[in-house]
Amino acid sequence: MKKTVIALSALLAFTGAVAAPNWTDWDTFKSVSMESGRVIDPSDSRLITTSEGESYALFFALVAGDKAAFESILAWTENNLAEGDLTKHQPAWLWGRRTADEGALWTILDTNNAADSDMWIAYALLEAGRLWNRPDYVTKAHAMMALLKKDVRTVKNLGDVLLPGRVGFENQGSVKLNPSYAPLFILKRFAAEDPAWESVWAGSLRMLLRSAPDGFSPDWVTFDREGRIVDRADEDSAVGSYNAIRTYLWAAMTAEDTPTFASLAERFTPMVKAARRLGRPPEKVNLNTLAMNHAGNAGFAGCVLELARRTPGETATADRLRTAVASHDVTRESYYTNVLALFARALDEKRFRIDAEGRLHLPLETR
């Protein structure tokens, strides 16, 4: 009985943290960035849609309890990026309008997949299936996970890792990885469905920690066949910027009372301190010299907000970052900043939380 009361109290506390079930940010995002289930990024003249944008929108629709939008996003993604069947085809990562010289057709522009987007789609399907009692979503998620497993590679002294895409990330035994493509809570959730993913979770944790020895995650990192980091000679590997910033957000979405979060929080403390010094996280960090350029935008602030909130002695830093991300207006022209801000503000407003097994928990009002 006592355990029941405690559990109920925790649930009520979580539920009560949200002032209202309506999520204005999501409604605005839909109105300015979505058409018929398609998320549009107008920063590219081809008016592109990426599997990333679709995957994030699925998660936001789930958090908002917006079943109609979820179904619309899923249908557009499946029909336009996955040849009509996500159980058989990984979604192409890039869709848009070809140039006039190429006929100005609306079509897939790059057939390669983006593994992180596939993971987010499968995760959203798993959790929508569980929370909304939709076994068809779970079946689809399992099929996507099976396709992803084909791109898992075992790296000596590192472990199992997931390639960022089917093509272009292997070279004579070395693998090029993107730390922001490895949200550990998603891999933990996959492992509950298929134990084979447990080793990918473990290898990905090692990759995240080893790729950031000074506390700053790189946009990309290459490991040789012995599991050693290849010299950071190229610009991608020598910089932590627009890709890497998500790594801190995913780390802070990990359940707080876990050894995994403790390891990540300790490793990424230098980024929190950098955000304190600059007022916001740096837009770019040179990982060879640790030189930093100017402070990043509101989306960058949002990515480090929760990590700062959980870091002892950084309450003032978290408050400044909260103010920064709150200042962002969701507009059509700012796709990437929009999605980072939506993740950060929803997390800070306790519209969702993720437990130690990677399960998504939502306040009752938003289901």
Set out the residue ranges of the language-model regions.
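N-terminal signal peptide c-region/cleavage motif recognized by signal peptidases
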Residues: 14-16
